Amino acid sequence: MSRNIIPKTTYQEIMLSGHPMIDVRAPIEFDKGAFPSSSNFPLMQDSERQRVGTCYKEQGQDAAIALGHSLVNGKVKQQRVDAWLAFIKQHPDAYLYCFRGGLRSQLSQQWIKEAGVDIPYVEGGYKAMRQYLIEVIDNAPAKQPVFILSGITGSGKTDFLLQRSEAVDLEGYAHHRGSSFGRYHEGQPTQINFENQLAVALLKHQERKEQCLLVEDESFLIGRSAIPKAFYEGMQNADILVLEEPEETRLTRLLNEYVHKMHSGYVERLGEEAGFTAFSEYLSQSITSIKKRLGSQLHDEFQTIISKALNMQLQQNDTQGHLEWISLLLTRYYDPMYQYQLEQKQERVIFKGSHQAMHEWLDHYRNR
């Protein structure tokens, strides 16, 4: 029987277009990592998959297939098919995939076809598409010149990146600002999902035929998200552009990021009282995370200042008290650390300037 299969040669088009896909793997597989445009409608739930897997190891493929059919039949089977059909009704051009493009894809496709709809499955499945995206990341630094956007904390690197088509926002895909105060309310993606989003962004960047690739100066770890090794090594050899901003501007920006945005985010999710409590814990835990570097005495000083600022905010609805600890954080922690790190790679710095000057430099490079 001939099958409706999407070949491996279309992986680039699938990722660039954000083609809707049905992932028929079990939820435990999907939760570890999937593709940005995929939705999980499993052929088997986790417990069913585990039983079939055990049967396969002990009794072989035929017995495992028979067990799978016995577990997913009747009303259960109809519920699975109905879920697929509902998705296909919303996305008539959908593809489906399993782990390797094997039995689960073929069986799902067959059941959908028996219901009157013929949709293709992706050759090679999740495993092959995932490998393709890994190769996209590994090869990206060699595709075009890479520039690293550096700058002292609060200089607005992310704001700048979001205005540039040459840029890929690593922190955005990691969902973390890359510092002790960098976490967001919602948490970070899995490592696989971080990498998959990065790969798709790089594909789109290459499709635009940009003159260079601009990324922020990052450590190997952005929160708990690790930059893929080959890509990170490419960053270590790239020229550096340093963004410069006045201290007052930096303080205002960090007050907005660390205090206003985080507080409002927690309140939006948890309500006024619980949100303020969670916000307070976020500030305290962020300082505690760098206690070893600060030393106990300075750490305790920070906690005291933060506590006073939180009390002022709670009692008077005034956030200006937070500027004291933010200023101290810059002068006693971030700024010395940044200056030391920049000195280690000073020979790679090719330009320093304000936001406007940096835009002009990159525009000139792009149009040269």
Curated annotation (Swiss-Prot):
InterPro entries: Rhodanese-like_dom (IPR001763), Rhodanese-like_dom_sf (IPR036873), SelU (IPR017582). Keywords: Selenium, Transferase. It catalyses: 5-methylaminomethyl-2-thiouridine(34) in tRNA + selenophosphate + (2E)-geranyl diphosphate + H2O + H(+) = 5-methylaminomethyl-2-selenouridine(34) in tRNA + (2E)-thiogeraniol + phosphate + diphosphate; 5-methylaminomethyl-2-thiouridine(34) in tRNA + (2E)-geranyl diphosphate = 5-methylaminomethyl-S-(2E)-geranyl-thiouridine(34) in tRNA + diphosphate; 5-methylaminomethyl-S-(2E)-geranyl-thiouridine(34) in tRNA + selenophosphate + H(+) = 5-methylaminomethyl-2-(Se-phospho)selenouridine(34) in tRNA + (2E)-thiogeraniol; 5-methylaminomethyl-2-(Se-phospho)selenouridine(34) in tRNA + H2O = 5-methylaminomethyl-2-selenouridine(34) in tRNA + phosphate. One of its GO terms (biological process) is tRNA wobble uridine modification. Coiled coil: none annotated. The active site is at 98 (s-selanylcysteine intermediate). It is an enzyme of class 2 (transferase). Its EC number is 2.9.1.3. The keyword Transferase applies. SUPFAM superfamilies: Rhodanese/Cell cycle control phosphatase. GO terms for molecular function: transferase activity, transferring alkyl or aryl (other than methyl) groups; tRNA 2-selenouridine synthase activity. Residues 15-138 form the Rhodanese domain. It comes from the Bacteria. SMART domains: RHOD. Monomer. Belongs to the SelU family. Involved in the post-transcriptional modification of the uridine at the wobble position (U34) of tRNA(Lys), tRNA(Glu) and tRNA(Gln). Catalyzes the conversion of 2-thiouridine (S2U-RNA) to 2-selenouridine (Se2U-RNA). Acts in a two-step process involving geranylation of 2-thiouridine (S2U) to S-geranyl-2-thiouridine (geS2U) and subsequent selenation of the latter derivative to 2-selenouridine (Se2U) in the tRNA chain. This is tRNA 2-selenouridine synthase. It comes from Shewanella woodyi (strain ATCC 51908 / MS32). The lineage of its organism: Bacteria, Pseudomonadati, Pseudomonadota, Gammaproteobacteria, Alteromonadales. The gene is selU.
